């Protein structure tokens, strides 16, 4: 069991910003996200795609500074983590690589991010047809 001042669930722009702000304010923060790297959908793989930043735009490149803030000594980042229970206390139960963990904190912040909601149209399930979000993931992978 580990204790933190704040547990942030979600490592997209909002989660990373909240984590950095809290850490710079003196709080010990645990940042959890299910993806293999922080960044959310908009900054997916920004730390890995340094050569692609130019053609993905300056806003995408700016996301690297968010990822860089996660190296603060008061921040513990766990990517590839699945949160499967949140109890009073608050107590967060999560797993990573098949190992379960229990972390407690004074506060929990949920930064679940955005989710694309596609609108079905004739032919939308045909091979090669994809949503804007799927195309964005493909470009950044």
What are these regions (language model features)?
Residues 1-4, 9, 62-141:
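FAD-binding core/adjacent interface of flavoenzyme oxidoreductases
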Residues 4-62:
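Beta1-alpha1 glycine-rich phosphate/pyrophosphate-binding loop at the start
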């Amino acid at each position: 069991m580990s204790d933190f001042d704040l547990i942030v669930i979600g490592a997209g722009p909002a989660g990373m910003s909240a984590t950095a702000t809290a850490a710079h304010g003196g709080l010990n923060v645990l940042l959890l996200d299910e993806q293999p790297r922080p960044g959310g959908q908009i900054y997916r793989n920004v730390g890995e795609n340094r050569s692609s930043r130019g053609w993905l735009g300056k806003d995408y490149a700016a996301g690297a500074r968010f990822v860089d803030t996660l190296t603060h000594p008061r921040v513990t980042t766990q990517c590839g983590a699945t949160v499967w229970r949140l109890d009073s206390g608050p107590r967060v139960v999560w797993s990573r690589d098949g190992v379960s963990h229990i972390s407690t904190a004074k506060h929990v912040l949920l930064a679940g991010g955005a989710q694309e909601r596609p609108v079905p149209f004739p032919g939308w399930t045909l091979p090669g047809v994809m949503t804007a979000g799927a195309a964005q993931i493909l470009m950044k992978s």
